[in-house]
Amino acid sequence: VIAGLRRIPLKRFEDERGWFMELMRSSELPKPVKQSNLVYSRRGVIRALHYHERGQDDLFACVHGMARVVVLDRETGETFSEDIGEDNPVAIYIPGTNAHGYEALTDCLFLYHVTEEYDADDPDEHGIPWDDPRVVDLWSTRSPILSERDQAAS
């Protein structure tokens, strides 16, 4: 088990109007959330592996569709992966300097809360190749759609 990593089950309440889901409570997290980001990804996209030297924590949730979360403990080499989203409503809390990312298993809306605000003048953004031998077998695709940044990490 990766130290500090948490699975947080999400409850979805539905009625004739639609549904409601609570995504996070600050009181239940080790650090306060300072920024939230919403990303739309097409099926086959991998956004990974990213890490933050200064220890930013991330809380991942897939709010529409399905995504595979992958986490790598850079010190021990231990890995974690889980498919989250509509079929498995779970948030994943990723502490500190662990490398992390996700694969869009379907077109998806992916929400992540972070414990540091992004600073374009001093970004704490670092990468490990998505196909690093420690995690390559955790992805469902061998030919992902990648950003230029994620391609450069390879």
Language model segments and positions:
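Non-catalytic, conserved peripheral segments adjacent to functional cores
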Residues: 1-90, 109-154
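Conserved SET/PR-domain catalytic core that frames the SAM/AdoMet-binding pocket
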Residues: 87-106
